[in-house]
Design a protein with these regions (language model features):
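Polysaccharide-binding and catalytic clefts of secreted carbohydrate-active enzymes
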Residues: 3-4, 9-176
Length: 178
């Protein structure tokens, strides 16, 4: 985190987390994804074929959101792919109700304490986007491990009563849910 501060998560107040906390990483960060892939590959090369290894546990208890500029831009790209036009997005989110129509994609930011909080469609899409980011991150981890040993089954633990991500979607990328 000291060498690559961009891997640290940003909270809803647009403040970057400090080193040392749990779950303080940005799942969107290309640097973080690359470093995790390198670590997963090295660990898999060392341990995947050990007879005591019967299942590979990916990252522990996926959780949380990041509001960094990169995540904001990826959210906008995800929305553009989903809706195509701002007009479609405005209609789907019913933004005219509170006179919050968007006229430029750069105006769209993740819902939170410093931004929009009353647009339910935006909140749901943010949850969907966050799930997508987590799932692609998790699947990249799985793929790195299974590139070393394709027969190795992968798992991650999903927490009870946790609503940040769609667990049914995450489960599609695992061999076993734990």
């Amino acid at each position: 985190a000291q060498k690559y501060p961009e891997v640290l998560r940003v909270n809803q107040h647009y403040e970057r987390y400090h080193f040392g906390g749990r779950h303080n990483h940005c799942l969107t960060s290309p640097v973080y994804r690359r470093k995790v892939r390198e670590m997963d590959t090295a660990l898999a090369q060392r341990y995947a074929h050990h007879p005591a290894v019967i299942l590979w546990h990916l990252s522990n208890e996926f959780s949380g959101d990041c509001y960094c500029p990169l995540c904001q831009e990826k959210f906008r790209q995800w929305l553009k792919k989903r809706y195509g036009t701002l007009e479609n997005l405005n209609q789907a989110w019913w933004t005219s109700f509170w006179s919050h129509r968007y006229t430029d994609w750069s105006q769209v930011e993740a819902p939170g304490e410093m931004a929009e909080t009353s647009t339910n469609g935006m909140f749901i899409d943010w949850r969907r986007f966050s799930t997508h980011q987590c799932k692609t991150f998790m699947m990249a981890e799985r793929d790195a491990v299974q590139a070393v040993d394709a027969s190795l089954k992968c798992t991650a633990n999903l927490m009870e009563r946790f609503w940040d991500y769609d667990y049914f979607s995450l489960a599609e990328g695992m061999d076993v849910v734990s």
